[in-house]
Amino acid sequence: MLQINDLTFDAWGRRFFDHASVSIPVGAKVGLVGRNGVGKSTLFKLVLDQLHAGDGEISYPKSARIASVDQEHPATPVTLLDTVLEADVERDRLLASLDTAPPEDLGEIYARLEEIGADRAPSRAAEILSGLGFRHADLSRPMSEFSGGWRMRVALAAALFAEPDLLLLDEPTNYLDLEGALWLEARLKKYPHTAIIISHDREILNNSVDHTLHLADGKLTLYVGNYDSFERQRDEKARLQDATKAKVEAQRAHLQAFVDRFRAKASKATQAQSRLKMLAKLPPV
């Protein structure tokens, strides 16, 4: 779904990505993790083309729809339900075209509306809004009556309703109560397309994702599994690296000791030279 190849990005006097590469599978639910300030939100901006990479390539299918929840929905006079319904741009366009389309095109329009489940859209939107804490009476209220925190929930509801091919969520539980966060966990787990989630909420990283993308030292590493699984795999990887490092260092010390001892002896010069070549071939640690 999302391919990042040899990405390098410098900004604000530092390097965020250093020849980073990763391939995100279609349909994966990915938790993007890394220490604070490492560049997780910056990666989202690069994918959304809000920032431009210096080198490398970020690619996805041309027809792919991408959505993120960057800010609260504006305080408009449009009702809550209609605001969410408008997020399905194709449905909105098809319904509007019914009044102006020539008769011979109406059959095709109605067929497409049926294909995308247009008649079920209001109930689906209402179900999402209910999960995020809105009451049934709120559906007919204008957006201007909701506070900024509730309009953030509307923006999230609209993104979930539109079901983009790639959904980018940055700390989505920050403006949700416990009930809303639990609902979102379950919703994301069964999201029908690819989603990448930045979160400090360990529960959502364990209960909603099936892959974990780790950003560290300018590199991206994709692990299969949730956050707990990622930690186990990372710890095991570090243990194996430490063991390999210790083995190489011991071998290096042994070879160097032989060279230092016998380099000056003519009878051992050939062997010492051979050990020097072996030293040069040892991998850096």
Where are these regions (language model features)?
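Intracellular alpha-helical coupling/juxtamembrane segments of multi-pass membrane proteins
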Residues: 233-258, 262-285
